[in-house]
Amino acid sequence: MTSGALPDNPFVAAGMIEDPRLFVGRKDELHAIASRMKGDQPTSINIVGEKHIGKSSLLYYFVLTWQQRVLHNTSRYVVIYLPLRGVDCRTETGFYEAVAEGLLNHVQGWQQRSLQNPWKTKPLNRQAFSDAVKEWKQQGKLPVLCLDDFESLLKYPDKFDNGFYDNLRSLMDSNALMLVVASRKQLDIVANVDHFGSSFFNIGHTIYLKELTTDEAIELSRLPTRSTNGAALSVDEQSHAQQWGDRHPYKLQSI
């Protein structure tokens, strides 16, 4: 968790909110993600929303706070955030290595070598990735991958083909892997447009990210700063932000 002083300007109009103290609302969505992690059959999720609606911030905040929502048997899960627009994720092997790096960061120390070793196979190709995920299942660990900007993979159909997606779907169906995938359009619609035939794109559950509720918008407009005990904006400025922003998180923070 982030500690220390709040920033002078608590509003983050462009980019992802990284300080959890500045994240507001989305309680229903956060609960929905956590509830689908629990149980013997985790359900993968597609988070769908327009640009600047807060998909990245939601995923990142969930990764920081999921233990507060799952509560029981938290040692079963390893939850990571992975922005797919990064250069490292432009090839299939690059994707697997980025996932491995994120997971290994959460299982450090000699006591956890049995969890580390499956991810150190070279090359970490499709088969090695599958074997590592299945080995973790045998050891009682569920990787939960929060994949941001999923459209980035779809730009490279020669690198990420139906076989890649079918393999992910197989791991999901065997309850060895859970994905939380953020995209601007629903995955099954994207698949039709881009002519992907994999059943991966018929993902288990879809959450549509919309504007904030009125109460959440008010809470956002009242965020404090490092230099004040109260809200960063005056009462008049808060009112203007709420009217102009129309409950849209990007607009509310662009005042």
Language-model features: locations:
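Conserved adenine-nucleotide phosphate-binding loops and their immediately adjacent elements
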Residues: M1-G25, E29-A32, R113-L115, F200-N202
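Phosphate-binding P-loop
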Residues: S35-P42
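Conserved Walker B catalytic segment
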Residues: S44, L124-Q186, V193-S199
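P-loop NTPase Walker A phosphate-binding motif
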Residues: V48-Y81
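Conserved NTP-binding/hydrolysis module of P-loop NTPases
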Residues: V79, R85-R113
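Short glycine-rich substrate-engagement loop in P-loop NTPases that contacts/grips substrate
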Residues: C89-T93, W110-V133
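A short helix-turn-beta junction within AAA+ P-loop NTPase domains corresponding to the substrate/partner-engaging
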Residues: D194-K210
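Conserved small helical "lid"/interfacial subdomain of P-loop NTPases
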Residues: I207-E237, W244, I255
